[in-house]
Structure formats: structure tokens, C-alpha cells
């Protein structure tokens, strides 16, 4: 089982973040994820707010094996520029970009002059964008007159050698799951790791795949799982932090939080993570260390480390 790690919520300086990613690579992690578009910043903490795309490419350039990814939000990007940026990253670090995208839902975007349309419009926008991006990556001249994406003979050079870059889409609602069925190589399951909730969303994705004649088994399943390696095995000590860092899951009861978090000794956390990956049929679990300081992040990285590659 390949394993990824996420360092989110702008908890680290560039120097610390690069050290953590170097450590993750040395310990055999398959991928590291960092913060995405800068307007995802919330609150008033004084901290480095590093541009997600710049950091992604900088980390790709300084590492050798590990994949690097960060969240792209559809209304932050022009389709052709995003296709070109991703193709450039692929040229710099072949096969190592984790291209993760979703519709976004951050009120802070308006501070940056970004006026997000409704959720339904953002779904349409993402559909148009990924259709255009796929064509550009194939080396085609793309003309499109969509509601949100308008291109007139756009091309990028160089296109990715394989004519494609794998796409991960994060989502849980039916309309986004239809986009997963249409465009995604990986479904980033944007849910707490609770079997009933994941099963319900999985059934909707399977239905959307059948409607398109696609085998849902073709789509890799990934999930970020809140992980805290610590001396206490009592998950209750992490509930407040879990809810603060995952406000979209704020309605979870304490019992559900206990089931949705991986907390305790390294051995306990490894066992729990393996159990969740098996139960939820995950191909690519990601331990979510968002919000942890550098020392606690290193402890978790070492405690959860997969076997080093030969």
C-alpha cells in the first residue's frame, strides 16, 4: 500500500516545509501534499502564506522520487494557463506531479477579488476546464465557447510526453462525483473515514460510472486521514483540533470523531490506518498532519513511515 502525507493549514515556513518533505521522501512516502491556492488562508494568524503552485514546483525541483501535490480551485485559474503550468511541472519532474483539483468553497476568496459562483456553476466550470485541459495535454489546438472557459485555438508546448497527466478530483456530492466519473484517474474522497458515509458516496459514483459506461474500478481511491502520533491513545484529546481544521465536518458527534481519527502510539496508528484502508477500499491513504508543528510532524512521519524503497 502506498502512503502519502499532507502538511496543511500554513503551519510551516519554507525552510521547515522543505525539510519535512525531504524527510518524507527519505522515509519512503509516495507523495507529499502542501497547501493549495493562497486565498485558502483563514483567520488572523501571522504565518507564511506560500503560494501553493510555486511551492509545489519548487519541491518537485529539489526532490528526486516523491510526488508533490496541492489543491487547485477551479475559479482561481484560466484553463489554458493551468494546463501549461502542469505541463511545465511535468517537464521539470516527469511523472511526479499530483494534479489535484476541486470546485472550492472558501469565503476568503473574495478578499483576493475572486467572486466564486454558486456550487452548481463551479461544477460546470470544472467540467469545462478539465475538458479543455485534457485536449491541451494531448497537444491539440483547443477552441471552446463554454459558459466559463473560452479558448480560441489555444495550444501548449511542450505537451506532456504521454499526452496526459493523471487527474485527482476531490469531492463527495453527486454532481462532483459525476465529474469524477467523467474525468478523474483518482477520487479524493472528501469525507470523514466513516464506512456508511463512504459507502453512500461510492454507490453514487458507481452509478455515475455506469451511466458513462466506465468501470469504477479504474478510478483509484484516496483519502486524507487525520493522524496524530502521541503518547495518549485517547482520541478525545484531538477532537477540538479535528473540528477546527476540518470545519466542513463540524457536525460529527464525538463517537464519529473517534472513528474518523487516527490517534495514539505509532503502532496503534499504523494498525488503525491499515484497518481503515482495508475497510474503505483505499488505494492511496494520506496521513493528514495539517496544523502540526515541525517536531510533532517529524514524530508522525517516522512513526507511520512505509518501508523504504529499494
Q: Which role fits each region the language model picked out?
A:
Residues 1-310:
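Active-site-adjacent structural elements that line small-molecule/cofactor binding pockets in enzymes
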